[in-house]
């Protein structure tokens, strides 16, 4: 074990024990306002050379509308099982948060867009780690 690990053992234990847990396995209680505030604060402590955060965190209040969105991006020939699975991403978990990016494009050839995308990804990791440190499980999903 390295000397650095020994000094920061609790940090490494927390990071190394974090794993994604799907919506069907998440249970109540969901994080309260204080827990969310702490996780979002951690999520905003990410490298961004432009000193502006190219994202925002939003608590989803209408899970049915989110389920509609997840279903709407499926191919036209998606079967009922695929539709139910897509909708379940929004409906099964005790709560849903959205990481909304500005000026992000994974297909861009623009260096600034790449940096904004990496900053948003770092924010997501800090958010998940912040929830895990408080005893909450979570998983990132996309539409």
What are these regions (language model features)?
Residues 96-102:
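Active-site-flanking beta-strand signature of metal-NTP-handling nucleotidyl enzymes
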């Amino acid at each position: 074990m390295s000397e650095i690990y020994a000094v920061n053992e609790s940090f490494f234990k927390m990071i190394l024990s974090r794993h994604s847990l799907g919506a069907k396995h998440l249970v109540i209680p969901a994080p309260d306002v204080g827990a969310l505030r702490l996780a979002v604060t951690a999520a905003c402590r990410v490298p961004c050379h432009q000193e502006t955060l190219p994202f925002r965190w939003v608590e989803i209040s209408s899970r049915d509308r989110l389920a509609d969105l997840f279903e709407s991006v499926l191919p036209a020939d998606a079967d009922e099982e695929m539709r139910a699975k897509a909708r379940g991403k929004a409906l099964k978990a005790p709560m849903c948060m959205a990481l909304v990016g500005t000026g992000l494009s994974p297909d861009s050839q623009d260096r600034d867009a790449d940096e904004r995308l990496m900053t948003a990804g770092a924010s997501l990791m800090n958010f998940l780690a912040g929830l895990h440190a408080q005893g909450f499980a979570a998983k990132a999903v996309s539409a």
